[in-house]
Regions:
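Short, exposed "boundary/linker" segments that immediately precede the start
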Residues: 1-6
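PLP-dependent class I/II
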Residues: 7-254
Length: 254
């Protein structure tokens, strides 16, 4: 079955109204690691909370342009009336992973301070990478390039989802992302994804255990699958093998 994991903004209300909370970090579109996407209402509500309680928000959007299906949604920043929200993007997911170059949009005074912090941290970003990207944007159609890679990733996503449905036990849950690079699998309670990883590595299959994404190591029965880097035949073969490992582990755990 598929299931989307959500953050309760209702639970965030009392948290925001404390002096201890200064910043909220969110990836609302094709989030890493779950692949989930926030609804329009959730985006608007977070902007309202930010304005009401004076809490800054960093909206990280490295995957937003990699949409395979569904309707594009406005950024949280587009609902910002108090100037508390920063929106960031990156060329690393749409152009070249090795070029760690991105951008940030926000209040002018905040951006000015960010520039000072950046200069004090490492002076500047990679000059050659910036010049390469600038020249590419002058010479070529970046939107055409994005459309091309979106089609590649869409096919890989489809194979990944179909393979999970075909080869994994029906006791798992997983997300069906409308874009981005990841899907998130939840194994039955009590099943350790880290133990499954040990077995799958013996068959040369790797994934990231979900507990790695939690500061307290929660959700040890979850894992992240990245379908972006492998051709479709290897995605199916790898997930078939992983599904067999999961079935065997669950059977032996009973």
């Amino acid at each position: 079955t598929t299931e989307i994991y959500t953050l309760s903004l209702h639970d965030a209300l009392p948290i925001c109204n404390t002096p201890h909370i200064k910043l909220i970090y969110a990836i609302p579109t094709f989030q890493n690691p779950t692949g989930k996407t926030w609804s329009l209402e959730r985006r608007r509500k977070l902007a309202e909370l930010s304005a009401k309680y004076g809490v800054a928000v960093i909206e990280d959007n490295p995957y937003g342009e990699l949409r395979f299906e569904g309707e594009s949604l406005p950024s949280i920043k587009s609902f910002d009336e108090a100037g508390n929200i920063l929106c960031t993007g990156s060329f690393s997911k749409i152009f070249c992973p090795g070029f760690r170059i991105g951008w940030i949009a926000g209040d002018k005074e905040i951006i000015r301070k960010y520039v000072l912090v950046k200069q004090g941290t490492d002076l500047q970003c990679n000059t050659i990478a910036q010049m390469t990207i600038a020249e590419y944007l002058k010479r070529y159609d970046i939107d055409k390039h994005i459309a091309k890679i979106v089609e590649v990733y869409r096919k890989r996503r489809n194979v990944a989802i179909e393979s999970i449905e075909r080869y994994f036990p029906d006791t798992i849950k997983f997300t069906r992302p409308e874009g981005g690079l990841f899907t998130w699998i939840e194994l039955p309670e009590g099943i350790s994804a880290r133990d499954v990883l040990v077995r799958s590595l013996e068959k040369k299959i790797a994934f990231v255990p979900g507990g790695s994404f939690y500061p307290n190591g929660n959700k040890e029965n979850t894992l992240r699958i990245n379908y972006s880097n492998m051709p479709e035949d290897k995605i199916e073969k790898g997930l078939k093998t992983l599904g067999e490992v999961v079935k065997e582990y669950i059977s032996q755990s009973k």
